[in-house]
From Swiss-Prot:
It holds the Pfam family RNase_H. CDD domains: RNase_HI_prokaryote_like. Signal peptide: none annotated. GO terms for biological process: DNA replication, removal of RNA primer. One of its GO terms (molecular function) is RNA-DNA hybrid ribonuclease activity. This is Ribonuclease H. Endonuclease that specifically degrades the RNA of RNA-DNA hybrids. The gene is rnhA. PROSITE patterns: RNASE_H_1. Monomer.
């Protein structure tokens, strides 16, 4: 997944991510849109019992994991938790052995570790966009996240119907 419009020798990729959850915890999904040149790739997935923050993290992890080589990435999210977590808070968490400033264990630490590992391969600019504000890339990621959530809920209903 690369783009001929590169910064230096790194391909330039734009990523939009979003997470969704019905109930918190509850069934949830994540969606990602990756754009490079004239190409677009969409990704989605979900879990039967999760949280909105876990789905926001999964969207970014899976999108970055999809890139086959080091890239110059502009990643857009409507989650301040994700953006601030990876750009501001994570450095302190690592220094404190994955504890918060209040000495509590960091929530979703295993996902933050995965995200941190994925970021090491790329040069990433993290951007925040207001959710549900008509931003086309974010809206598409939101649609994918909700579609994944719908699929999780449908599979659960089907499994429950089969048990009767």
């Amino acid at each position: 997944m690369t783009d001929s419009h590169a910064t230096g020798d790194m391909p330039r990729v734009t990523i939009y991510t979003d997470g969704a959850c019905r109930g918190n915890p509850g069934p949830g999904g994540w969606g990602a849109v990756l754009r490079y040149g004239q190409h677009e790739k969409t990704l989605k997935g979900g879990e039967a019992v999760t949280t909105n923050n876990r789905m926001e993290l999964m969207a970014a992890i899976q999108a970055l994991r999809t890139l086959t080589r080091a890239c110059d990435v502009a990643l857009w999210t409507d989650s301040e938790y994700l953006r601030k977590g990876i750009t501001e808070w994570i450095h302190g968490w690592v220094k404190r052995g994955w504890k918060t400033a209040a000495k509590q264990p960091v929530k979703n630490a295993e996902l933050w570790r995965e995200l941190l590992a994925e970021t090491q391969r790329h040069r990433i600019e993290w951007h925040w966009v207001k959710g549900h504000s008509g931003h086309e890339g974010n809206e598409l990621a939101d649609t994918l996240a909700n579609a994944a959530t719908d699929e999780i809920q449908a599979a659960k209903r089907q499994a429950m119907a089969g048990e009767q």
